[in-house]
């Protein structure tokens, strides 16, 4: 079964590059920052399962999930 998801984008609007395909600690951390629990390295970029379009940009994800009131 195909799981929906997205490639998250960093502060520069680029996908996160990764070198270790499949299980990837860096990608898992990236996906947590973007508000989802799991992700992995696919085609040399981090892919996050169940990542919604609204949270693809790290700026949007930070606004949606950070508890810090700065910028609100």
UniProtKB/Swiss-Prot annotation:
Domain of life of the organism encoding this protein: Eukaryota
Keyword flag Membrane: no
Main location: secreted
Intrachain S-S bonds: 18-41, 27-46, 31-48
InterPro entries linked: LCN-type_CS_alpha_beta_dom, Scorpion_toxin-like_sf, Scorpion_toxinL/defensin
Disulfide bond among keywords: yes
Tissues and organs where the protein is expressed, per its UniProt entry: Expressed by the venom gland.
Record keywords, A-Z: Disulfide bond, Ion channel impairing toxin, Neurotoxin, Secreted, Toxin, Voltage-gated sodium channel impairing toxin
All copies of domain LCN-type CS-alpha/beta, residue ranges: 3-67
CDD domains: neurotoxins_LC_scorpion
GO molecular function: sodium channel inhibitor activity; toxin activity
This protein's GO CC annotations: extracellular region
Cellular location(s): Secreted
Cited function: Binds to sodium channels (Nav) and affects the channel activation process.
Record family assignment: Belongs to the long (3 C-C) scorpion toxin superfamily. Sodium channel inhibitor family. Beta subfamily.
Domain comment as written in the entry: Has the structural arrangement of an alpha-helix connected to antiparallel beta-sheets by disulfide bonds (CS-alpha/beta).
Name assigned to this protein: Toxin Acra II-1
Organism expressing this protein natively: Androctonus crassicauda
């Amino acid at each position: 079964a195909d799981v929906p998801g997205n490639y998250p984008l960093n502060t520069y609007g680029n996908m996160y590059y990764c070198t270790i395909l499949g299980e990837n600690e860096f990608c898992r951390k990236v996906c947590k920052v973007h508000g989802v629990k799991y992700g992995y390295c696919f085609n040399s970029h981090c892919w996050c399962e169940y990542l919604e379009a609204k949270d693809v940009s790290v700026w949007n994800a930070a606004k949606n999930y950070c508890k810090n009131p700065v910028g609100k």
